[in-house]
Amino acid sequence: MQATKPAITGAQIRAARAFLHWSVQDLAERCGVSESAISRAEKMDGVPSMQGRNLNAVRTAFEIHGIEFLDSTGLRIRPR
């Protein structure tokens, strides 16, 4: 059984996007979530009130590009 990953926060979404030098549009294209939904999520304190599948799509887009989320505190590049 796979462990559930903790939800990511708006601050982590902003930080991961900045780390990868992605615009909101870049992230939206990579994860299939609207730019407006991403912008709203980034402005929220804590876990965004975004549909679970959208939040998972955002997380997956970052993880594919090497981002590893650390609980609700930060992120890093996944070691190879």
Task: Identify the function of each model-found stretch.
Residues I13-D26:
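Short basic helix-loop element that most often maps to the first helix and adjoining turn
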Residues S23-R40:
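Short alpha-helical DNA-recognition segment
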